[in-house]
């Protein structure tokens, strides 16, 4: 499983996320994470031609993605990286303020539950969840926190 912390480290998590994008039809998939990435760990073009920018947060249970991290990504994902769809994927969860900020800014949150569903093929890809999705969108779950 993509969220198996014993099988993956942070670099492998970024690669596994990129592999899911490839599996689900994205093109030009690139792992760009590392020092100086300005929040973009994976970039791709969705099957319908939109630019996808993903930040991967490889966190342990109980270590949630916070508002400050979300705001840093929010400051670069659309302006610097020119994302049509911005996504934060985590092996954990999001704090309420982080999820609220993401919703206000149009950033898609993929927590450990959604990650398992996406990885297992039982849930949608992140680009089908966002406010700019071309299909019917899924509202922000209230159980993220």
Residue spans for each PLM region:
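Mixed-charge (Asp/Glu-Lys/Arg
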Residues: 1-38, 43-145
């Amino acid at each position: 499983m993509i969220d198996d912390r014993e099988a993956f480290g942070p670099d492998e998590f970024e690669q596994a996320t990129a592999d899911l994008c490839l599996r689900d039809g994205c093109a030009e998939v690139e792992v760009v994470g590392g020092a100086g990435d300005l929040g973009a760990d994976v970039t791709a073009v969705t099957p319908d031609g939109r630019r996808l920018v993903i930040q991967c947060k490889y966190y342990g249970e109980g270590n949630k993605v916070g508002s400050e991290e979300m705001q840093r990504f929010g400051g670069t994902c659309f302006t610097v990286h020119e994302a049509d769809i911005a996504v934060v994927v985590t092996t954990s969860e999001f704090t309420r303020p982080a999820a609220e900020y993401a919703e206000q800014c149009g950033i898609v949150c993929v927590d450990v539950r959604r990650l398992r569903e996406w990885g297992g093929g039982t849930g949608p890809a992140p680009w089908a969840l966002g406010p700019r999705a071309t299909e019917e969108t899924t509202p922000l779950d209230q159980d993220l926190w």
